[in-house]
Protein backbone atom coordinates (compact mmCIF):
# COMPACT_ATOMS: atom_id res chain seq x y z
CA UNK A 1 0.00 0.00 0.00
CA UNK A 2 1.21 3.48 -0.85
CA UNK A 3 0.64 6.89 0.72
CA UNK A 4 -1.52 8.01 -2.21
CA UNK A 5 -4.00 5.23 -1.40
CA UNK A 6 -4.38 6.51 2.16
CA UNK A 7 -4.89 10.05 0.85
CA UNK A 8 -7.52 8.83 -1.60
CA UNK A 9 -9.54 7.23 1.20
CA UNK A 10 -8.93 10.04 3.66
CA UNK A 11 -9.86 12.83 1.27
CA UNK A 12 -8.05 16.06 0.62
CA UNK A 13 -9.50 18.34 3.29
CA UNK A 14 -6.68 20.62 4.33
CA UNK A 15 -6.80 23.38 6.94
CA UNK A 16 -3.91 25.82 6.86
CA UNK A 17 -2.58 28.92 8.57
CA UNK A 18 -0.02 31.61 7.76
CA UNK A 19 3.32 32.27 9.48
CA UNK A 20 2.04 35.65 10.72
CA UNK A 21 -1.05 34.11 12.38
CA UNK A 22 -1.18 34.12 16.16
CA UNK A 23 -0.62 30.81 17.93
CA UNK A 24 -3.74 31.37 20.04
CA UNK A 25 -5.82 31.53 16.85
CA UNK A 26 -4.22 28.31 15.61
CA UNK A 27 -5.21 26.61 18.87
CA UNK A 28 -8.80 27.74 18.34
CA UNK A 29 -8.84 26.44 14.75
CA UNK A 30 -7.28 23.12 15.74
CA UNK A 31 -9.79 22.66 18.58
CA UNK A 32 -12.80 23.59 16.43
CA UNK A 33 -11.71 21.34 13.55
CA UNK A 34 -10.43 18.49 15.75
CA UNK A 35 -6.94 18.69 14.24
CA UNK A 36 -3.56 17.70 15.60
CA UNK A 37 -1.66 19.75 13.03
CA UNK A 38 -1.86 22.70 10.69
CA UNK A 39 0.07 23.26 7.50
CA UNK A 40 1.60 26.72 7.50
CA UNK A 41 1.47 28.33 4.06
CA UNK A 42 3.25 31.50 2.98
CA UNK A 43 1.80 32.92 -0.24
CA UNK A 44 0.45 29.49 -1.15
CA UNK A 45 3.74 27.66 -0.57
CA UNK A 46 4.45 25.41 2.35
CA UNK A 47 6.44 27.24 5.01
CA UNK A 48 6.19 24.70 7.81
CA UNK A 49 4.05 22.56 10.10
CA UNK A 50 2.48 23.27 13.44
CA UNK A 51 1.39 20.43 15.72
CA UNK A 52 0.06 20.28 19.23
CA UNK A 53 3.62 19.32 20.25
CA UNK A 54 4.98 22.76 19.29
CA UNK A 55 2.02 24.47 20.95
CA UNK A 56 2.53 22.58 24.22
CA UNK A 57 6.23 23.43 24.13
CA UNK A 58 5.42 27.11 23.64
CA UNK A 59 2.93 27.03 26.52
CA UNK A 60 5.48 25.38 28.79
CA UNK A 61 8.15 27.98 27.96
CA UNK A 62 5.74 30.90 28.39
CA UNK A 63 4.12 29.93 31.70
CA UNK A 64 0.89 28.75 30.10
CA UNK A 65 0.19 31.74 27.87
CA UNK A 66 0.68 32.27 24.15
CA UNK A 67 0.03 36.02 24.02
CA UNK A 68 0.82 37.42 20.56
CA UNK A 69 3.24 34.61 19.67
CA UNK A 70 3.32 34.07 15.88
CA UNK A 71 3.35 30.69 14.19
CA UNK A 72 6.63 31.55 12.48
CA UNK A 73 8.24 31.55 15.93
CA UNK A 74 7.20 28.03 16.90
CA UNK A 75 6.40 26.06 13.72
CA UNK A 76 8.68 23.38 12.33
CA UNK A 77 10.29 25.15 9.38
CA UNK A 78 11.64 22.08 7.60
CA UNK A 79 9.34 19.15 8.42
CA UNK A 80 9.98 15.58 7.38
CA UNK A 81 7.90 14.91 4.28
CA UNK A 82 6.33 11.95 2.50
CA UNK A 83 5.69 11.36 -1.18
CA UNK A 84 2.55 9.81 -2.68
CA UNK A 85 4.51 6.81 -4.00
CA UNK A 86 6.10 6.04 -0.62
CA UNK A 87 5.24 2.58 0.69
CA UNK A 88 3.34 2.55 3.98
CA UNK A 89 6.05 0.45 5.67
CA UNK A 90 8.63 3.12 4.76
CA UNK A 91 6.25 5.82 6.00
CA UNK A 92 5.79 4.03 9.33
CA UNK A 93 9.53 3.62 9.72
CA UNK A 94 10.10 7.31 8.93
CA UNK A 95 7.47 8.37 11.46
CA UNK A 96 8.91 6.11 14.15
CA UNK A 97 12.52 7.10 13.47
CA UNK A 98 11.82 10.85 13.45
CA UNK A 99 9.04 10.97 16.03
CA UNK A 100 6.83 12.84 13.56
CA UNK A 101 3.12 12.26 14.12
CA UNK A 102 2.07 14.22 11.03
CA UNK A 103 3.79 14.28 7.64
CA UNK A 104 2.95 16.57 4.75
CA UNK A 105 2.72 14.69 1.45
CA UNK A 106 4.47 16.59 -1.35
CA UNK A 107 4.88 15.96 -5.07
CA UNK A 108 6.77 18.30 -7.38
CA UNK A 109 6.57 21.10 -4.83
CA UNK A 110 2.80 20.72 -4.44
CA UNK A 111 1.19 19.86 -1.12
CA UNK A 112 -1.22 16.94 -1.60
CA UNK A 113 -2.27 16.46 2.02
CA UNK A 114 -1.13 15.49 5.49
CA UNK A 115 -0.86 11.94 6.81
CA UNK A 116 -1.16 11.30 10.53
CA UNK A 117 0.08 8.33 12.50
CA UNK A 118 -3.60 7.49 13.08
CA UNK A 119 -4.24 7.48 9.32
CA UNK A 120 -1.41 5.00 8.88
CA UNK A 121 -2.59 2.76 11.72
CA UNK A 122 -6.15 2.74 10.34
CA UNK A 123 -5.00 1.89 6.80
CA UNK A 124 -2.77 -0.95 8.00
CA UNK A 125 -5.54 -2.37 10.19
CA UNK A 126 -8.07 -2.26 7.34
CA UNK A 127 -5.59 -3.92 4.98
CA UNK A 128 -4.91 -6.68 7.52
CA UNK A 129 -8.64 -7.22 8.12
CA UNK A 130 -9.21 -7.59 4.38
CA UNK A 131 -6.32 -10.07 4.03
CA UNK A 132 -7.62 -12.09 7.00
CA UNK A 133 -11.10 -12.32 5.46
CA UNK A 134 -9.64 -13.44 2.15
CA UNK A 135 -7.46 -16.09 3.80
CA UNK A 136 -10.33 -17.40 5.93
CA UNK A 137 -12.51 -17.67 2.82
CA UNK A 138 -9.74 -19.50 1.00
CA UNK A 139 -9.18 -21.93 3.88
CA UNK A 140 -12.92 -22.50 4.35
CA UNK A 141 -13.31 -23.46 0.70
CA UNK A 142 -10.16 -25.62 0.60
CA UNK A 143 -10.88 -29.02 -0.96
CA UNK A 144 -11.04 -31.83 1.59
Model-derived segments and their meaning:
Residues 16-34, 41, 81-99, 106:
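The conserved cystathionine-beta-synthase
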Residues 30-33, 38-53, 95, 103-120:
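A glycine-centered beta-loop-beta connector
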Residues 1-12, 51-96, 117-144:
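Tandem CBS (Bateman) regulatory domains
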Residues 6, 11-38, 45-46, 50-62:
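N-terminal first-folded block
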Residues 24, 44, 73-74, 109, ...:
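Residue-level signal for alpha-helical context at structural boundaries
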Amino acid sequence: MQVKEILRVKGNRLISAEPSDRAVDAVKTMAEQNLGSLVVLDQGRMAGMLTFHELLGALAKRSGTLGDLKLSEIMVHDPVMATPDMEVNDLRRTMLDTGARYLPVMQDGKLLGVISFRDVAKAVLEEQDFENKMLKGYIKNWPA
